Curated annotation (Swiss-Prot):
Organism name: Drosophila mojavensis
Protein's name in the database: Serrate RNA effector molecule homolog
Task performed by this protein: Acts as a mediator between the cap-binding complex (CBC) and RNA-mediated gene silencing (RNAi). Involved in innate immunity via the short interfering RNAs (siRNAs) processing machinery by restricting the viral RNA production. Also involved microRNA (miRNA)-mediated silencing by contributing to the stability and delivery of primary miRNA transcripts to the primary miRNA processing complex containing drosha and pasha.
Pfam families in the cross-refs: ARS2, SERRATE_Ars2_N
Bias (Gly residues) ranges: 55-64
Amino acid composition bias (Basic residues), ranges on this chain: 381-392
Length: 980
């Protein structure tokens, strides 16, 4: 037992031994020195390679100090990690474990701890920002890390630390005055800010996302594209407003299905769908196709073999091999020719005919008594025939078969031939009856379709009547089919080609004319085929359903055109959307690729995962469908006072966004007038004519017409004053929720306008960016949830105030910076930059000998080079002017992207600023840990005070506890603040 316990302790101490051995090419025991003891592997010094022999306490030759083996020993000679950079050796991603003290690494659960090793990909990109950590500004973020005083994780880029005033004074002369110091320090801060903006622009000016924002050509093109999307959405909204779709739905969570239908209708219209495609919303989702498994077929056939003794024909069928062994069943219903003999479906075999006429008549009489036995007989007969055909084919192909097998095949052929000879007469009679029934059905259909005033029946076909007639004809044909014998369904293909069709074309095949019929009958049946064309015409398309792939990591240098070039090779590709980069992810982006619903999205995702774009793995995964498209908001929003405040907010947001994108400007007056004529009645909601003057909200938007009528608040103030009713009495228990349906209908129209046109979810106080390129063009909406029973006026006022603050981002207008403001930030002059460009391309080789590097030509003077550049290299000069405008557009944006400030640039405490970066960190316990040597508090015990802990329990009152004794000089003046 002692040996077993020792072995157990060894395994418990070294739980990663097997994982390390898997990375080694040779066994670990062979690498151990031979001079050690037998149990030297159990020594603590080997388990902990950072301890020396003195720490181990002796105990074997293997107990000396060892170095930690390199990861190459563990990893072997396999390929490098998937997410690794080519120029950097890294351990496998699965072996990266966070330290317990690194709380900063988990500060951001979304992008914290570099889950996809973006930092490893971005080593080449980091060199662009190497100038950020220049001398005099402290170490870079990656060098300092979380413990270097930066206070941020190594995955976040920041600006270099700006010198404090004290550090700046150390660089100046001692005799400098205070005013001169402040002036120079202000200039230093201005130059520092200009330098950071310029370096950020140079680092990102070649990236597509940056060009779409500020480039003079690309930004205009992108703005026009977005404006086109908004115009199309506006047209769709006005169309839905005109036909009453918008007015028939309320933005309540109880009407989730109606809201989803409105959103899907918008998507279908945006995708170019027609009213015919909208019928797909009324159809129920189809069941998934049945997948036939061969294992179940074997068991079913085995069950049939077990039921053989119950069949009345077992005595004759026992000599055939098909009754005892399970045979192959069909997977789809087709005719029983010899080429697809294994695709027959036993479900179409009807228990009407046997091997001869008498047995068939007897079976008809016994059918009500024993139906299961008849089915089993038919299935066995079908299997027998398959085996006979198989034997017949094999006997024709194989010349070396034995005489016994030949005789069996001949006997089988004789039985089959006799069977068909017996059934021939009965088949002809039933065929005539079936043709007669089909003639009657076609005549009835023709009488219903032909109108008295129309000479052509195709022009007056009503789809509903056609469907009803078709269903009646199909029922009659099914009845005729049940009367047909088994032999008729098993005829060769030369008898009737119409019987080749599958189950989905069964009704069409039944209406086709038979061979040898009269011409009048053929014409009538042809008209029935026209009914099929009416029914099976263009089916509605499910344009609102898509499949999509999510790209987790896209390098900043990857363009949208490159992704489109890869995705266009796959069928069903629709569009691609790329999100704006985030500084937390080192400017890496995310993307969504949209395909049609009928593609194999997993196969496409697998193909994308096997491809690398610009040496970057995109990390493609399948994007799931939206789980809940209608999500509830606070039910207090249905209160009348809150609804009126929401109408005011929605109207302001709509006007601000319309003005930002110039949706209802004078240039589109004709379109706006047409829209007003279409939606004028429903926009006013019966409150008056649309031509009446509106005050406060002057907009051509039909949704905002006469909106001020609903913004005037009414109250019975005089009545309450006379009756002595005070509003404070309601604050105790609150007042019930008061709903005003007229106000709610106006608010719903505004909320849906913001959601459909501007992609603003009002009740979620957020905007869904680039929604027209996303897989779901109208995906999620928040609606009013269940209302509470009562609400106080204090809650109402707080809710209105809080909601107003959350929506300020849509209420504030974006104002570009003026020329004076951007001049302070380092704006450039186009003519000055052009002059610098000319001077840079004018080189003096010798006296009266000048060179133009752009063309390599030599000139006698610089004025000739200047004229040459403006004449022959005009496109280069134009590029310089565009570059200047590009940079100035970046400076004009008040919300321009830039690196966050270094934490050291903010105002620090005196203790932090006095300690240099070269000192070791203080020996304080971690923030979230107890001090060293203290045990955690027990349950029910005391504890320490603080924000996250309960107050300390005191056994005695505060005044009875021991007071702190202080000492002071007796000659000192009396200080009442001193403690005694």
């Amino acid at each position: 037992m002692a040996d077993s316990d020792d072995e157990y302790d060894r395994k418990r101490r070294d739980k990663f031994r097997g994982e390390r051995d898997s990375y080694r090419p040779e066994r670990r025991d062979e690498r151990r020195p031979m001079g050690g003891a037998a149990n030297s592997r159990d020594e603590w010094s080997e388990r902990n390679p950072f301890r020396g022999s003195s720490a181990a306490g002796g105990g074997g030759g293997g107990g000396g100090a060892r170095h930690r083996p390199d990861y190459s020993d563990y990893r072997g000679s396999g390929p490098r990690a998937r997410y690794g950079s080519p120029g950097r050796e890294m351990p496998p991603a699965k072996r990266m474990r966070p330290d317990w003290g690194d709380s900063e690494m988990r500060s951001n659960p979304r992008f914290g701890y570099d889950p996809y090793l973006v930092q490893a990909w971005n080593d080449h990109y980091q060199s662009l920002h190497s100038a950020y950590s220049h001398a005099g500004h402290g170490p870079s973020v990656r060098e300092t890390g979380p413990a270097g005083g930066g206070g941020v994780s190594g995955d976040t880029q920041t600006q270099p630390a700006m010198l404090t005033l004290k550090q700046f004074l150390d660089t100046q002369d001692e005799n400098i005055s205070d005013s001169e110091v402040m002036r120079k320090y202000t200039e230093y801060k201005t130059d520092f800010k200009r330098q950071q903006l310029n370096e950020f622009f140079v680092a990102h000016k070649d990236e597509e996302w940056f060009k779409n924002k500020y480039h003079p050509e690309d930004s205009v093109r992108r703005s026009e594209e977005q404006r086109g999307f908004l115009k199309r959405r506006t047209e769709v909204f006005l169309e839905l407003l005109e036909n009453g779709t918008i007015g028939s739905v309320k933005v309540d969570s109880s009407q989730a299905d109606a809201l989803v239908r409105v959103l899907d209708t918008c998507v279908i219209k945006l995708e170019g769908g027609t009213d015919e495609d909208l019928k797909i919303l009324d159809e129920k989702p189809k069941d998934p196709p049945i997948v036939y498994e061969r294992k179940s077929e074997t068991t079913e056939s085995a069950v049939v073999a077990k039921r053989e003794p119950e069949s009345p024909k077992t005595e004759k069928d026992d000599d055939l091999p098909g009754a005892s062994s399970p045979q192959h069943k069909s997977l789809r219903p087709v005719n029983l020719d010899e080429e697809n003999w294994d695709e027959d479906e036993p479900m179409e075999v009807h228990p009407q005919t046997g091997k001869d006429g008498e047995k068939s008549d007897d079976r008809r009489s016994k059918e009500p008594e024993d139906e299961e036995s008849v089915k089993s007989d038919n299935e066995k007969k079908l299997k027998k025939k398959k085996i006979k055909k198989r034997k017949r084919n094999s006997s024709d192909d194989d010349s070396s078969s034995s005489s016994s097998s030949d005789s069996d095949t001949e006997s089988d052929d004789e039985k089959v031939k006799a069977k068909y000879d017996v059934e021939e007469g009965l088949r002809a009679d039933q065929k005539a009856e079936a043709l007669k029934d089909k003639e009657e059905a076609a005549t009835a259909a023709k009488e219903k379709l032909l109108a008295p005033e129309s000479p052509q029946p195709e022009d007056v076909v009503d789809p509903k009547e056609a469907l009803e007639i078709k269903s009646e004809a199909s029922e009659e044909s099914k009845q005729d089919k049940t009367e047909q014998p088994v032999g008729q369904t098993e005829r060769p293909t030369t008898d009737n080609p119409a019987e080749k069709n599958g189950e989905e074309e069964g009704a069409k095949a039944e209406d086709k004319p038979e061979a040898g019929t009269q011409e009048s009958t053929a014409n009538e049946v042809t008209e029935t085929i026209d009914l099929d064309k009416v029914k099976d015409g263009p089916h509605p398309r499910a344009l609102h359903r898509t499949s999509s792939i999510f790209l987790r990591n896209l390098a900043p240098s990857i363009t949208k055109a490159e992704i489109e070039a890869i995705c266009k090779r796959f069928s069903g590709y629709l569009r691609v959307a790329i999100a704006d980069p985030l500084v937390e992810r080192r400017w890496y982006r995310r993307g969504w690729i949209t395909f049609t619903r009928d593609v194999n999205i997993k196969e496409i995702c697998w193909s994308l995962n096997n491809q690398r774009l610009r040496d970057c793995e995109m990390g493609a995964i399948v994007n799931r469908d939206l789980s809940r498209r209608v999500r509830p908001a606070n039910g207090i929003t249905a209160h009348k006072q809150i609804v009126r405040a929401d109408i005011k907010l929605c109207a302001k947001i709509a006007m601000n966004l319309d003005d930002r994108f110039k949706l209802w400007c004078d240039s589109n007056r004709s379109d706006a007038e047409d829209a007003e004529k279409k939606a004028g009645q429903e926009a006013t909601n019966g409150s008056g004519a649309s031509s009446s003057p509106s005050y406060g909200f002057n907009s051509k938007n039909p949704v905002l017409q006469n909106i001020t009528d609903y913004l005037i608040e009414e109250a019975s103030a005089e009545e309450e004053e006379l009756l002595g009713l005070a509003g404070d009495n309601k604050d105790g228990d609150g007042e019930p929720i008061e709903r005003d349906e007229s106000l709610i209908s106006v608010l719903d129209r505004l909320v849906l306008y913001l959601r459909i046109v501007h992609s603003v979810d009002y009740y979620n106080h957020c905007e869904y960016p680039y929604e027209d390129e996303m897989p779901n063009r109208c995906g999620i909406i928040h609606a009013r949830g269940p209302a509470p029973m009562r609400v106080t006026s204090n809650d109402v006022q707080e809710y209105i105030k809080a909601y107003d603050g959350k929506l300020q981002q849509f209420l504030t207008k974006t104002v570009q910076l003026s020329d004076e403001e951007i001049k302070e930030l380092g704006a450039k002059n186009p003519e000055t930059e052009v002059e610098k460009f000319v001077q840079a391309n004018t080189q003096e080789l010798a006296k009266d000998k000048w060179l133009c590097p752009l063309s390599g030509k030599k000139f006698k003077g610089p004025e000739f080079i200047r004229k040459h550049i403006f004449n022959k290299h005009e496109e280069k000069v134009e590029e310089v002017r565009k570059e200047v405008q590009y940079f100035n557009n970046y400076l004009r944006d008040p919300k321009r992207p830039q690196l966050p400030e270094h934490p050291g640039s903010s105002k620090r405490t005196e203790s932090e600023s006095g300690r240099g970066s070269g000192y070791r960190p203080p020996m304080y316990p971690p923030f979230s840990a107890m001090p060293y040597g203290f045990a955690p508090p027990m349950m029910g015990g005391g504890g320490r005070g603080g924000r996250n802990f309960p107050p300390v329990r005191r056994e005695m009152p505060l005044e009875h506890q021991r007071r702190i004794i202080g000492y002071h000089d007796l000659d000192a003046p009396i200080n009442s603040d001193m403690f005694d």
